[in-house]
Amino acid sequence: MLTVPKVPENFFSFFQEDYFPRLTPRGLNIADNVASLFNDYNLNSIDFTGFNLKLLRQNDIVLKNKVRYNFALQMGFDTVYAGKNTTILKFSLQAQTINFTSLQELRDSFENNGNTLSTHLFWKPVVEQLTTDGGNDLTNIAKTAIGESLFNLKVNLTDSIIDQSVLQQAQKSFEDKILDPFHAERVEAKRIHDEEARRLEAERKRIAAELKAKEDEARRIREEHWAFYQSTRDVKSFKEFWAKRGKNVADKKQLIEALKLSFQAKQNPTFELLTNAFRNAINWYYNHKKHDEEAKRTAFGSGGISFAQSGLNGIFMPNWLRWELINRANIQLQLQNVKVRENNFEVNGWGVPVSINWNDHNNGINYRATTPWTYGFEITMNYKGSYGLKGIYWTLANWGLGGIPPEWSGDMELKFQIDGKLANWITQKQDYPGSLFQFQNDKLLFTLHVVQRITVKD
């Protein structure tokens, strides 16, 4: 009844064929048709529930007045088989001696050959209960399948019962041949498993550390990029960003170094920072710090701001004309206010950002580029002014020659429009300095395109 699948044949070789009860691959020497019922099941557990030996008395089936005896032993088992459904099986194994009418007949059933005492046992499995975990009771079906199967086996009583060393030797043989090699194999398998587990854990930690390092580096780079991007918003942020990296941008040389590094990293944000700073510096110089000469000298040196300058020196004209106006006309200009306004979108169109058309291949801007950058702002300088022509100029003007009045007093508006739109006729001039945005020693050379408009009232 007890099938033992997936077990090597040598597992059943520790007792001789005449040992009882002896487990075989088919179970307890039961027939194939019975053993096949358990092909789809594996033995999950087995409990030995009892052992009993009885002297049975029964009437002879031929001679009604004659009584026969036999010794019967019964072993009970509770088992659980696992398969498609868990099956609970309770059965008993009943074994009997021959029927005898006298003690001599019983003695004659035993055979003594040397040191071996043998006898015949007649035995059969008896199903007590067969149910599945689904509640199906298959007891009657199992009893019908087994029927009155009776098996005859010549049993070596010496090995099976009398000589305890046989069981001890079988146990030792089992330990030596099966258990110890299996234990050694499992110990080695566990060692390999543990070693592989340690390797995998070390690999997991290494990969996790690498991923964390990469994540930290990626986060650091993102933070660095963001901090750099934020630094190009205004001069204050730029100064703080580079101060953390060991550069004092209040020093001109270190400022140029920081600007070079910033420009190499991102041209357009740095270009926008500089054009904004250019515009804001003019506003700062003439409005916010217009009475603070010390601050002006600190920022721009003793020469002051180079563009846009106030007075007659701030107007683009030939030097000879400037000399004439100063010396012949006694011109006077008093600056009243300065307004600076960004008009990039008006100049370049809505949605066009401030940018520099950098040529990476040439590592710079094309020398005669007509649109080297897109940006634009406007400076408006309002003056109160007057002049009075002297000598022959006064006489000629008074006669109406040249359409110039001999004297004037009133308001003048000087407007500069700065952008990146250079006409082709300008860039093709022989004396054109080049469309430059270039660091040179401690200077940044920047070619401006300026349109000057002068409006005189009164």
Swiss-Prot record:
InterPro entries: DUF237, DUF240
Origin superkingdom: Bacteria
Record-stated family: Belongs to the MG032/MG096/MG288 family.
Name by which UniProt lists this protein: Uncharacterized protein MPN_510
Originating species: Mycoplasma pneumoniae (strain ATCC 29342 / M129 / Subtype 1) (Mycoplasmoides pneumoniae)
Lineage, highest ranks first: Bacteria, Bacillati, Mycoplasmatota, Mycoplasmoidales, Mycoplasmoidaceae
